[in-house]
């Protein structure tokens, strides 16, 4: 019996040492490997269901939430950054990510250029640096043209880096027909 107890203790000790060795250093707990400063993620090298780096991934994100305060980045947009970071951290090259993020509903205002955002909300648009970083990583950031009209924004107020789509409804269904997967955020 003493031999079994010693064996169990040794196995538990060895597994706890392995678990500690796999953890990143305290300063590296959160990382943003592709979209610097946004979409933080925690590396899990031994995790299940990791994406295959050889495949191409097509996702259309439906962005419907602005920040709780006008000076906060949209949590939906930040989740797009997290998704990019998760795929890149798993070894998938940016060239294998075909991502489109379309804003509508409450998220429509996140795509306004800085002067019009400031006029509407009283602060600079905190989403523009993230939109620029996403565009740089190959993500097409778009806005529902119908939502722009519903919010009584002018189309010229939309930041020049953002694609004005006919609608979120047609963008999503058109891209789904082309093999994209919908991720509502």
Model-derived regions, located:
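Positively charged n-region of N-terminal signal peptides that target proteins for export
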Residues: 1-5
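A cross-taxonomic marker for long C-terminal extensions/tails that follow the last structured domain
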Residues: 22-25, 29-36, 40, 117-118, ...
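Solvent-exposed, acidic/flexible segments
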Residues: 66-76, 124, 165
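Histidine-anchored nucleotide/phosphate-binding helix
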Residues: 73-92
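Acidic/histidine-rich, surface-exposed loop or edge segments in extracytoplasmic proteins
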Residues: 52-70, 112-115
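Bacterial N-terminal signal peptides
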Residues: 6-16
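Structural recognition of the beta-strand scaffold that forms the well-ordered cores
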Residues: 58-62, 99-103, 140-143
């Amino acid at each position: 019996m003493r031999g079994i107890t010693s064996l169990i203790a040794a196995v538990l000790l060895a597994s706890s040492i392995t678990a500690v060795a796999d953890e990143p250093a305290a300063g590296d707990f959160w990382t943003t490997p592709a979209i610097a400063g946004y979409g933080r993620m925690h590396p899990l090298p031994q995790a299940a269901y990791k994406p295959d780096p050889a495949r191409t991934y097509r996702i259309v994100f439906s962005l419907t939430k602005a920040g709780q305060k006008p000076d906060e980045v949209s949590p939906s947009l930040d989740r797009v950054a997290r998704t990019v970071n998760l795929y890149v951290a798993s070894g998938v090259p940016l060239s294998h990510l075909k991502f489109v993020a379309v804003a509508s509903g409450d998220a429509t205002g996140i795509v306004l250029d800085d002067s019009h955002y400031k006029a509407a909300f009283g602060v600079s648009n905190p989403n523009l640096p993230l939109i620029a970083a996403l565009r740089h990583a190959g993500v097409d950031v778009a806005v529902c043209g119908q939502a722009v009209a519903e919010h009584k924004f002018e189309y010229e107020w939309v930041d020049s880096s953002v694609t004005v789509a006919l609608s979120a409804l047609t963008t999503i269904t058109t891209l789904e027909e082309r093999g994209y997967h919908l991720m509502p955020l």
